[in-house]
Structure formats: structure tokens, C-alpha cells
A protein has these predicted regions:
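Hydrophobic/aromatic-enriched cytosolic interaction surfaces used to assemble or bind macromolecules
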Residues: 1-161
């Protein structure tokens, strides 16, 4: 069983760099497209770090007495005036005490590409790499600064912007 951590590039969701448990995550490997991961099997895990600048994150406490659909509707209602695009252009997700907003076109394209692989896939915003609830953290990774906040939200900015 091998684990790979792929950090997608800022704007091209099919390119980036990855690290592998084969060498204890020491080597930086570039990839272009997902062909690099086609040989992974069901025992392997691919952790995909999506650039946080492409993911809106908001604190949101789900009500365990309500269904997932009702919680999602409540989340959308809470934040719809805070997002710059139309609600219908986005995908909304809830994880633990946070809600996430991702451009639907990017999300579906990435999901379609990743579903071709045979391994277990975990998709996270890149700021999760150094997330610790209750603490604010700034991390430099590749050409980005990652900001993780004490409430579990975060973002990233390109070093050159």
C-alpha cells in the first residue's frame, strides 16, 4: 500500500507536483495529467490537495437532528450573499464544522478525471496540510502561502501575486 500526495497547480487542475510514501515523501515529482497515477490500485491512496484559492471555506455547524440535505440548504442560505457567483454555478459540501464552495465546472471536471483511477482518493483544500483547530497557521508550500485559521477555514495565495 502506497500513499501519494498530489498538490495541484494553481489554475490548471491536471498539473502539479506529488510526493510518495515510496521515498518517505522526500522527492518532489512533477506531473502533467493523471497518467502518473493510472498504475495505482485499490490498495493505494491518492491525497489530492486542491488550491485553496479555488475553494471558499466558511464555518458552519451542522445540526445533527436535521438531514444532510437540510443542513446543506441552511449552509447555502447562510452564505449565498457572500459568494461572488451564482449559487447554481457552485458545488457545496460540508465537512465537520465547515462548509465549502467550489466552482461546479471545476469540481465536476476534477471528479470525472479522478473517478478514472482505481485507488482510494481523498480531496482536501491545500491548507489542510497544516490545519490544527484552535490555531492560526501560515505555511509556505511550493509557490503558495497557505493560511489555516483556528476555526478550520483557510485559503491560499500565490507567492507571486
Amino acid at each position: 500500500m502506497k500513499t501519494y500526495v498530489a498538490h495541484l497547480s494553481n489554475f490548471n487542475l491536471s498539473d502539479g507536483i506529488y510526493y510518495s510514501s515510496k521515498d518517505n515523501y522526500k522527492s518532489i515529482n512533477k506531473f502533467s495529467g493523471l497518467k502518473e497515477f493510472e498504475n495505482l490500485d485499490h490498495k493505494d491512496t491518492l491525497i489530492v490537495l486542491l488550491p485553496s484559492m479555488l475553494v471558499g471555506s466558511f464555518p458552519f455547524k451542522s445540526n445533527e437532528k436535521l438531514s444532510q440535505q437540510v443542513n446543506l440548504a441552511n449552509f447555502i442560505s447562510d452564505i449565498d450573499s457572500d459568494i461572488p457567483s451564482e449559487v447554481s454555478q457552485n458545488e457545496f459540501l460540508i465537512y465537520k464544522n465547515n462548509g465549502f464552495v467550489v466552482n461546479k465546472k471545476h469540481y465536476k471536471s476534477l471528479n470525472n478525471d479522478l473517478s478514472q483511477l482505481r485507488c482510494k482518493i481523498l480531496l482536501f483544500p491545500d491548507y489542510f496540510i497544516n490545519l490544527e483547530h484552535g490555531k492560526n497557521r501560515i505555511t509556505e508550500l511550493n509557490e503558495s502561502f497557505l493560511f489555516s485559521y483556528e476555526n478550520g477555514t483557510g485559503t491560499s495565495v500565490d507567492k507571486n501575486s
